[in-house]
């Protein structure tokens, strides 16, 4: 097969996400304790309740996780007694604190060598439901585009997100491959859009979904060899 475009998931594909989110949440909490003491110790359950109310009022934020988080912070701050202007300012500042901390992550060591090798032969893109920014991580030069669910309000596994990626990558589904860790969002989503899908499975989990991925890898450094075999028709 001829491959022109390779798209990548980000979270839990190019780095381990859970530790950095836990750390970012802790950093946010500490900042709020210092700069918004009225809110500082609010229970997490209270924030989740606000989140549900925000989504009921603004369902279009479902896939815009940055805007949603900022709205939750704003409403929590208002309810804690800050006036509208203060709540707006503190929400902006606290969200930026979270976003900065969210990018203090450790990219898997094989990521950059693999991207460098692939970028010499293929167009590379990002398709993510998260709010990580490859520009903040020094990875932007490898990618022709980075498509986030927030950009168009549609999230994986919706095929429309992958169709948008094909347009931006100037490719057709039969010449594109997607790599990701999530059986539904990444594998099923890509396959439903007509792409081949490679399951990134570093921990050797058992595949349990009905339709198997087109291939499985434990490390991203397996990608160049796998794609070369596909190109040869092996």
Where are these regions (language model features)?
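Asp-based, Mg2+/Mn2+-dependent phosphohydrolase catalytic module
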Residues: 1-6, 18, 85-87, 112-234
């Amino acid at each position: 097969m001829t491959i022109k475009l390779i798209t990548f998931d980000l979270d839990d594909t190019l780095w381990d996400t859970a530790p950095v989110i836990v750390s970012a949440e802790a950093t946010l909490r500490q900042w709020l304790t210092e700069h918004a003491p009225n809110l500082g110790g609010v229970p997490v359950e209270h924030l989740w309740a606000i989140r549900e109310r925000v989504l009921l009022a603004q369902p279009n934020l479902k896939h815009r996780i940055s805007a949603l988080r900022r709205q939750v912070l704003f409403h929590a701050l208002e309810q804690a007694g800050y006036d509208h202007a203060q709540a707006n300012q503190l929400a902006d500042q606290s969200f930026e604190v979270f976003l900065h901390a969210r990018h203090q992550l450790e990219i898997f060591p094989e990521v950059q060598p693999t991207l460098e090798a692939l970028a010499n032969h293929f167009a590379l893109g990002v398709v993510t439901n998260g709010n990580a920014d490859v520009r903040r991580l020094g990875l932007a030069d490898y990618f022709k585009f980075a498509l986030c669910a927030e950009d168009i309000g549609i999230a994986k596994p919706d095929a429309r997100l992958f169709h948008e990626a094909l347009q931006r990558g100037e490719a057709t589904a039969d010449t594109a491959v997607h790599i990701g860790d999530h059986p539904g969002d990444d594998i099923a989503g890509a396959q439903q859009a007509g792409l081949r899908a490679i399951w990134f499975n570093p921990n050797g989990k058992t595949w349990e979904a009905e339709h198997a991925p087109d291939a499985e890898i434990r490390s991203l450094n397996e990608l160049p060899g796998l794609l070369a075999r596909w190109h040869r028709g092996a």
